[in-house]
């Protein structure tokens, strides 16, 4: 996806500035995802919400932002499988190799789910490329949004809109209150008062 976004590699010739070609390519890629993806799940958080919650609870000692969102995705995927009576099937928790704080994520998944997450390169797992595309689109929405008042749906690009409308999904932004609630439920200690 990064080669496409920057018109490099296999997209170096004839792609840069050719918006009609780029949009048609994206539309076709999204249609493939619509045809083959049963559900997509994602979690995001504003750094400011994470830092506010970390002032109250020992959040960063428990989970850094990437592992926090990853664990949330695993929980949502497990809930989806149960709700659709698919929880008897084995589930792999696959994440892109080389992601930050992998050790923390690995440890937490082992403790919570009694199985290790799997690290794979994007080239080895097509699903990671689709997930990377969706994450890129969602990140663009969140990076341009006013945390307090903006309507996210007005920011959807056509391709992201196609994903949202056509594939069952569960994703959203984790707020300070949500992070603090999770810390409380998990019994993570509060910070000592100065």
Question: How would you name each of these model-derived features?
Answer:
Residues 1-194:
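Phosphate-ester processing/binding pockets and catalytic centers
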